């Protein structure tokens, strides 16, 4: 089925705001014939404050900008070496509920890390993916007219120190992890294809077309 096809865009390293704007425009203007898309991107350093975000969780932003986002959740950090995957899916067409999509994204990351020999798990009380007690992947979504946008952010080989300037996802003292702590050779270039392969498998292996911007 043609509409089952997914366009995959590799966007490289980009500022947060133009990508967020493009994601909103895509979602606002799509119709029933619009193909779903997955965007793979890294962002320049930025704190994003989710819809539920409270100012007290931003401790010392310093020179890193703080941008309001309409995704679910609290404050998080994006920076180079973190693989962000935005999922622009027509949930009605794919017969997915919101909770099912959250579970699917978490399982995508768990499966990707398992391939690398890293045992990870989701938590019922705090969305995302964890290795032991440390958070390695953040997750935040928005649904509009039955279509999802925003997505997940997987820490690959980034500098984790900016997370100390916030209470990540609203949890004071939440420790963060990255793949390179276990696999020093990990980069977004070699993790992104695994992440994509795993999410497509969980979406029942639709046809896809890879587009590099």
Swiss-Prot record:
Its EC number is 2.3.1.181. It comes from the Bacteria. GO terms for molecular function: lipoyl(octanoyl) transferase activity. The active site is at 169 (acyl-thioester intermediate). Transmembrane segments: none annotated. GO terms for biological process: protein modification process. PROSITE patterns: BPL_LPL_CATALYTIC (PS51733), LIPB (PS01313). The record marks 135 as: Lowers pKa of active site Cys. Residues 32-207 form the BPL/LPL catalytic domain. Substrate binds at residues 71-78, 138-140, 151-153. Keywords: Acyltransferase, Cytoplasm, Transferase. Catalyzes the transfer of endogenously produced octanoic acid from octanoyl-acyl-carrier-protein onto the lipoyl domains of lipoate-dependent enzymes. Lipoyl-ACP can also act as a substrate although octanoyl-ACP is likely to be the physiological substrate. Belongs to the LipB family. This is Octanoyltransferase. It comes from Escherichia coli (strain SMS-3-5 / SECEC). The gene is lipB.
């Amino acid at each position: 089925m043609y509409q089952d096809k997914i366009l995959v865009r590799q966007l490289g390293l980009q500022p947060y705001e133009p990508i967020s704007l493009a994601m909103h425009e895509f979602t606002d203007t799509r119709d029933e014939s619009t193909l779903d898309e997955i965007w793979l991107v890294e962002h320049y350093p930025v704190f994003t404050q989710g819809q539920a975000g409270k100012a007290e969780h931003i401790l010392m932003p310093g020179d890193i900008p703080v941008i309001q986002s309409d995704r679910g959740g609290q404050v998080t950090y994006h920076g180079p070496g973190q693989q962000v995957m935005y999922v622009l899916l027509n949930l009605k067409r794919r017969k997915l509920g919101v909770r099912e999509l959250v579970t699917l994204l978490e399982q995508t990351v768990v499966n990707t890390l398992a391939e690398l020999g890293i045992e990870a798990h989701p938590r019922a009380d705090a969305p995302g993916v964890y290795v032991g007690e440390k958070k390695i992947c953040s997750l935040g979504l928005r649904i509009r007219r039955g279509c999802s946008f925003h997505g997940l952010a997987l820490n690959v080989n980034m500098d984790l120190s900016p997370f100390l300037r916030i209470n990540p996802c609203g949890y004071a003292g939440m420790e963060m992890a990255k793949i390179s702590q276990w696999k020093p050779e990990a980069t977004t270039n070699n993790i992104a294809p695994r992440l994509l392969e795993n999410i497509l498998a969980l979406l029942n292996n639709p046809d896809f077309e890879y587009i590099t911007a």
